[in-house]
Structure formats: structure tokens, C-alpha cells
Amino acid sequence: TADALSCSLVGSEMGIRVRGKAIFLLAPLVRQRKGHYRELFESMRRKGYLYVRLDGNILEIVPNMKTDRYKNHNIEAVVDKLVVKEEDEERIRKSVATAMKQGDGMVMVLEKGAKEAKTYSKRLMDPVTGIAYQDPAPNMFSFNSPEGACPHCKGLGKVNQIDIKKVIPDDKLSIHEGGIAPLGKYKNQMIFWQIESLLSKYDLNLKTPICKIPGDAMQEILYGSLENVKIEKEKVHTSTDYFCAYDGIIDYLQKVMEDDESAAGKKWADQFISTIECPECHGLRLKKESLSFKIWDKNISEVASLDIDELRDWLEEVEQHLPSMKAKVAHEIIKELRSRVTFLLDVGLNYLSLNRQSASLSGGESQRIRLATQIGSQLVNVLYILDEPSIGLHQRDNERLLNSLKELRDLGNTVIVVEHDEDMMRAADWIVDIGPKAGRKGGEVVFQGTPQEMLKTDTITAQYLNGKMAIEVPALRREGNGKHITIHGATGNNLKGVDVDFPLGKLIVVTGVSGSGKSTLINETLQPILSQHFYRSLKKPMPYESIEGIENIDKVVNVDQSPIGRTPRSNPATYTGVFSDIRSLFVGLPEAKIRGYKPGRFSFNVKGGRCEECKGNGYKTIEMNFLPDVYVPCEVCHGKRYNRETLEVRYKGKSIADILDMTINQAVDFFENVPQILQKIKALQNVGLGYIRLGQSSTTLSGGESQRVKLATELSKRDTGKTLYILDEPTTGLHFEDIRILMDVLQKLVDRGNTVIIIEHNLDVIKLADWLIDMGPEGGRGGGQLLFAGTPEEMVKQQKGYTYKFLAPLLKKSGKPE
């Protein structure tokens, strides 16, 4: 693109670039257009121009001069011819001004003997195509602004389109059997009659497998018919056959997506939609014009796609190579950019790119980005509160995070960190320990003081820090069952075509620095492959070549930290299914039988037994408009959820509301003689949740608590010993003691013959693994390789990657050979 410059700037640059050289100053008049141009040459001659550059050749202008009218031509007027000297500055400036006036804001500088001329312009214009660009403004480089956003995808970089593979997931089925997913199995409905009529033209019917229906017929079924289709009069109960238009399955789905005001309708249509890269901007989110502006051969999207450490190197390169005039303008901007990049590097985020979507960031990554922002602001006398900033951070980067927090403190601020990380506790100036246990047995300050003082106390936290309590390394690693699942050629995100073997019947821990490819391998490749196989999941796995050994397991379960329910009505009792058993128990009581109560009577979700004032919620919601909603206990049932008649039915003196208010520990004692109920609530107790209430709202449970409720549900089921469990950083939010309990539960699952795969940074989990898979060596583009696979002891011996350095001292402390 031509430089947008003023006459003086063009003159100054010429003085530097072509000093001492003979040049022609040209005014462009015609660019790649046909015509004889006799009038143009005559006009130039009358204005006093003696020479013209015609199609690259300097010619004298003569009377009646003309060109071949059927060929494309380039014509420039020769405004001046001179050898550039310092004393000619005023002459150059005037000639440039004249050339720009004649050339519509453009001037060309041609060195004597050269074939190509350099073009300058007052406007931003491509000298070859003649395309002009508006002057750049900040909004032009923002995909959140109409000035910059790609008009096709509105700046999202992606567009939704109907996926035929989701509409027809199995073409071996017939339409009658439900081969077209949006329609389901055959029903006596108009759309099936229409399709039947279309197929009859090809001597086919609804029971023909879709794979045997010719392409033309499928095209009509999916995208509509140009002709009206005939419906037999018997089907529509009319005196004559009925003819109607048929728009096709795809058109119907499009209308639901675009026009349906019902959220349920859109949600239904979403399952047949795939998100693809925008074909206009190719995922870059900006207009073509915005992407035409480049600095050091990179447009803004290319710069935004760089990892943070690559961005640092690019900034240094730009500053070194910018011309002096531009370098002066850019110096302060680059200085500020480098400062912000350094802060991001200091908190261990070197593997992130600037265009990484915030929704894909972990909680720890989001906190560390905000932390980097605060360090950069250089504020003082501020109280900072951080909740587990070490989430998702490898031990290698812990020290950098600690240094960043200390830097905030040293500026004159106070930093309060809610954290379970041992390094963070030992580095603290002051520790406040809350306990002594969880739930109703917690809520007290059991210690406050320095870490050194804490080591002398006997709180649970102190005992783990001073070594009196510990999560022990197992004496032997499991051999497994000899079977495997193997992925070949995984290339999703930063994976470098890795082949990974997962031995079954073992506790497998996947390690590696942040951004090394752990989640891509497990959550984005392995799990979707297995979910598609077992549950016909619509989520597509990341690219891979092949997988072996799926037949060696019978199901896959992802035990994550997402809530067990989205509304306050869901609770541990409903999630585990024990509430159905409790209701059945109440239905069998003599009082309930006399009154004719059914199980629905003891449900707070349906009419009959619930309090109708609060609809079984136990509280009323007061909307506060611009403030968070306020919840107050129901004035009728006083939070018990049920009406008076339902609460009159009691088991061992307790109503259904009393039982929901019991802790798990209390419920275990209460139902000790009811095996069916005891089995499920005992599982909750075994995962360390004895302190929560049976009817505690799911919205009040932490991520770790929700995860353990899910684990308890799995434990209470009868399994075949062929299940694969996947957990992503299950220790998030967990104390040492919670981790011990969690790992005991997971070990029990493996002891039954199942396989557990954990993505984890916590060394107390890593040291318990039967098998380690270490990804790396770095994050982002520097990662994606399989560094190691084997036992923890073998990892320490081979000394590959970073994880072994932190694992070795723990194995040594436990007496395990290194």
C-alpha cells in the first residue's frame, strides 16, 4: 500500500533516499485503461509539459500524439527531472505539490535507469489496483466495532451453519426409522407425507435406507422441491388430492434458528448446527480493509495470534528495524506494550495468545491476567483479594506468581489470598487458618500468625505442613489389566501428531506446564471420541488419525466441577437418586397409605404435597432490578417446602423436610437399617461430604463438593470394572485433607478394575499415579509433544521435562528410589 504522506514529508524522505541521484518526478494520470488519449496529450502540451511516461517509457510529447485505443495503458506526466541535492529542497517540495495536484494526490519517483517507480500518496491507496483506504482509526482495528468487524460474521470469526452429518447421523437408517434426526421416527404428519410423495417419483418409499436414496431425491428432501407435492386425499380427508409446496428440512431449521422466538425452539435447532470458520475473514474477525494495514509484514490479527513470548520478540524486532522518524513515534507505544507483555510473562502466561477467547481461560488464568493488569497500574494502598490464583499453574511457574504477588505487596499494598497451595502458605507473611473442619463443624479461626508459628500448632493444615500428616506414596504401582487405548496422530491445537498409549486398570495422571496440550489431548480429543462411540455425542473431537482399544471399556464418565444442577431445587438427594428411595419409604408408611398418598405427594416439584405459596422452593424471591435478587423464607411453610398435611407423615419421628435438613453424617445413622438408602448416602460420606445437608441447594456447593457428589453417585452404582473416568484438575479448591479423601475414592474406583485419567499439577496427586503422561516441553507452540510415559520413579530417572524436578524430592522423602 502506498504511504500516506504530505508534500513536505515526501520531499524530506526523497532527500534521504535518493540524494545525489538523477530522478524523474511523475504525476500518474491513467492506470490500466484503454483509449487513444489524443486530447489528454494535447492538454498536457498546452500546460507546458514536455515529456510523458507511457507504459514505462519516457517520451517527448508531440502534436497529434495518440496511443493504441484497444490496449490498456499507464500514463504519467513528467513534472520535473533533476539530480537531488540538499539545496534543491524548495524546488523538490514545489514539484511534489504540482505532481500531487495533477496526479489526484499521488506522486511517483523514478530513478534514472530504474524500471519501477516508488509511489507516494496523500491518501492510502494501492498504486497498482487504485483501491483507496480510509485513514486508520482505533475502531477500524476492533472486531467489536462496526467500523472494523467483518460484515459477514459480525466480528465473531465464526458462523453457524446446519451440519448435514448431524441432520443425518446414520445414513444406514431409513426415514421411517428416524434417519433424519430433526424428524425422528415416522409419525402420521404432513412432512412425512410430503417426503413420501417426493420419494414415490423415484419408485422409493420411507422405508428405503437413506444411503440408497439417489442424490437428486435427497437434494429435494433437504432443500425443497420446485414443484408442488401431491398428498393423497385419504390422508388429508378432502374430496380431491391436495397439492402443496415443500420447502425442505434445511429451510425449516433455518427458519427456527432465525425466526423462532422460543428459546426451546432455538435450543432444539442448535443440536443440528455446527460452527465453522467465517469464509469471508477466515476467522480473523476483521474487514479486509483493516487487515490491509501491516507493521513489519504483520497485520493486527497476525500479531494477536502470537504467543506472549513471541510477541515480546516481535516488538524488539520492530523497534530495531523501524526508520528513525517512525521509531520516534512508536517508541512510547512499544515501551508501554513491552511493559504489559513483561507482566503477563511474569505470571506464567507466556503460552497464551492475545486473541485467546476469554471463555476458554481457566479461573486461574483469568485471575493472573487481572493480576498482571494491577501490577502494571502501579497503584498503592490497595487491598487485593485473590481466590486460588495458582489454579492450573505448574510448579515451575509458581515462583513467578509468588514474585508477582510480592511485587504488589512491596508497592505498598495488602494482598489477601485464599489458597491451598503449600508454597503459597510457606511464602506468606501472615496465615489465617479457618476450621477446624468443614460445614457445621467449621467457621472458626483456629490460627492466625506467621507460617513459622503455625508449624508448632496442631491444626489439620499445620500437621500437613510440618509433616505429622501426609498423603503417602503407594508401596507398589498397579500393573493394570494388560489392555490399552491408544490414540495415533493427534494434531488438535498445538499437538504435534502425538501417539499416546493409555494402559487400562490404572490411575493415570497427565502432567505438563500450562498450555502444553493436556486438555487438548484428553478433553478435546480422547473424551469426545469415546462419547461419540458410546453415546452418539455430537461434539466433534480434535483431529487425530486413529484410535485402538475402545472395545476394552464399556463407558466413559467425565467427572468435572460443574454444578450438579442449575437451580436451587437441585440438591445431593435428588442428584444421587436417594430422594426417590426416601419418598418411596414415606409412601409405604401406614399414615401415608391411610391418606392415599403417592410418591408425588412428597415431591417439592409438583402440586399436591408442596407449599403452593413458594411452589416448593422454601423461599420467595424479591427482584431488586439493578441489584442482586433477595431471597426470604416463605411465610407459610417457613422454609420447609411442604404443606402441613404432608409434614404430618413421619418416619421415626421425622418429616420429609426434617430429613432433607439432615447432614449426610446424621442421615447415615438415621437410615442404618434401610440398605437401599444407606448405600447411596454412605457413598457421600465416604467422599468426605458428611457435613453437607441432604437437601442443600446445588447452587451453594463449591466446585470440589459438586465433583465429589458426582463421584459418590458413581461409587453407589454397580459397575462392570470397565469404566474410564476423566477428571480435569479435581484438586481445585481442595485442602490437603480433602485431596487425601478424594484420592482414596479414586483409588477404590481403580481397585474395582476401572481406569481413572486425571489432568493435574498437584504433586500429591502426581506421586500417587500408577502411570504418568507428561506433555510439553513448553506451553503454546512450544508444547504439544509427548515427553514421557511411565511410572513416577521412571520419570525421575529419565529426567525429562520439568515435572520430575519437583516430583523427585517427594519420592525421596517417602523413601522411594529415585
Regions found by a protein language model. Give the residues of each.
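Single conserved hydrophobic/aromatic residue that forms the stacking wall/gate
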Residues: A2-G11, G15-I16
